[in-house]
Amino acid sequence: MDIAGLIPGASKGKGLGNRFLDDARQADALIHIVDAAGSTDTEGRPVIPGIGDPLFDVQFVEEELDQWLASILERDWNKLVREADNQKMKLEHTIASRLSGLSIKETDIAHTIAELGLSRARANGWSENDILRFCKKLRDRSKPIIIAANKADLHSAQLNIHKIRDTRKNVVPCSSELEVMLRRAAKKKKIEYLPGDSRFRINDTAIMNEQQKQALQKASAFLNKYGSTGVQEIINRTIFNLLRFIVVYPVEDELKLTDRKGNALPDAHLLPVNSTPRDLAEKIHAELGKGFLYAIDARSKMRLGADYKLKNNDVIKIVSATSSSR
């Protein structure tokens, strides 16, 4: 989902801060698109390229999210700790209840407490700094951020990309402008190009003016330098690296790898790592999951049980009592 922009002070309601934070609470990961060329200021206003500071943008977004989480817990921290003590509940369970609706798992809370060496038994002694440290680490674990260093095709972006990479590990240089240009050229049959490709081919019949030729030369140089425009790469890295999803292909015919209409590999489902054939069946349809009997690995033709751990790019036939297969 696309969410509202953020400016300093969002955790206190400045600008569209409340809307941003409401959107962000639903997210499992965040792609932070920054102007790597430094051609906008902190409030998104155009400036001369190189004047803006994208590293500041990266830092303040993280800080606003951390402050927002901390404000939720600090509001009545002592009461929260007493509730955990009085009801004999684990501290992480009580915190998870307070943060309900934020897509934060209780296990992530428990791991964060342990990693920071914070005391569960003496949680009422946590300082404001302890709570902020906890929220920072929890946010990093439960809502990881990947940086899309956009406008990387501009000269002023190079130094800024190095600066961001010196302090952040998940950074992808990209050019949304070049990606749009390549997609439009492909749509008009001037080139052959698929999102994420490291190169494109100019069609023999393509008629282009000098400006279009220069634009393609610029795109080619960018692809040679970075391997892609970065747009598809950042989506792939978010899904497969940060969120650790796998892609699985359900089929009706495990021999021809088709659905009942004869379409080859018609569907692809994203599932969390360690998902099972039953999980896949339930995602396709609740009734299919209820009647799940077994699955078949289309490659090996082996029968798979309900608890088998699916692997990335598995092609699976589901056999169910409620429907012969999917």
What are these regions (language model features)?
Residues 1-31, 37-60, 125-136, 323-326:
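Switch II of P-loop NTPase G domains
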Residues 28, 314-316:
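Structural signature of the urease/amidohydrolase superfamily beta/alpha-barrel
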Residues 77-314, 321-324:
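C-terminal-of-GTPase-core extension/linker across diverse P-loop GTPases
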